[in-house]
Amino acid sequence: FEIVNETYKNLYDFQQLTEKQIDEYVNTYIKKADLNLVTGVVDGNAGNKLVAFGVSFPSFTDALREIGDGKLFPTGWLKVLKVLKWHKTDTVDLLLIGVLPEYRKKGANALIFADLIEQYHRYGFKWAEAMPQMETNTGVQSQWQYLESEQHRRHRCYKKKI
């Protein structure tokens, strides 16, 4: 998670993760993750230092829509479990991708996607959904030019003094 802090530190409104937050994320998400959908890039010339990572999860969106009333019990939890354990969805969510600044524009993203896309095909995912990204972050926006991609959602925040 040190890579997360280093990678995102210059993004608008990003707050460094504390040790407590890191522990919480590891216990809540990483322990439940399918490690085939998590990848890392190491620099063998720098003592196998981790320089980039990618974390993805099967999308729970369709399962939660199917539940409809929002109740996990008595049977809603089974739909969520099918996604978590058996990947019964056609969409994967790209949760986090991070590359240390000194390794950007050197192919680290390509290595991340080369590994992850192979796993996505193996699991039968047809779509990948990226989490919100700043439109002004040209570094992250430019990576999509090499893939068949479509921006179909925009998030906006507005301020108004009351």
Locations of the language-model features?
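Conserved catalytic-core motifs of GNAT/GCN5-like acyltransferases
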Residues: 129-131, 145-161
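A conserved beta-strand-loop-helix scaffold within acyl/acetyltransferase catalytic domains
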Residues: 1-98
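Conserved structured core elements
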Residues: 16-23, 106-111, 138, 152
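Conserved beta-strand-loop-alpha-helix junction that forms the acyl-donor binding cleft
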Residues: 99-104, 130-140
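Conserved acetyl-CoA-binding loop-helix of GNAT-fold acetyltransferases
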Residues: 91-99, 104-120, 146
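Short conserved micro-motifs at the rims of enzyme active sites and ligand-binding pockets
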Residues: 65-67, 104-107, 141
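Conserved GNAT acetyl-CoA-binding A-motif
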Residues: 91-92, 120-134
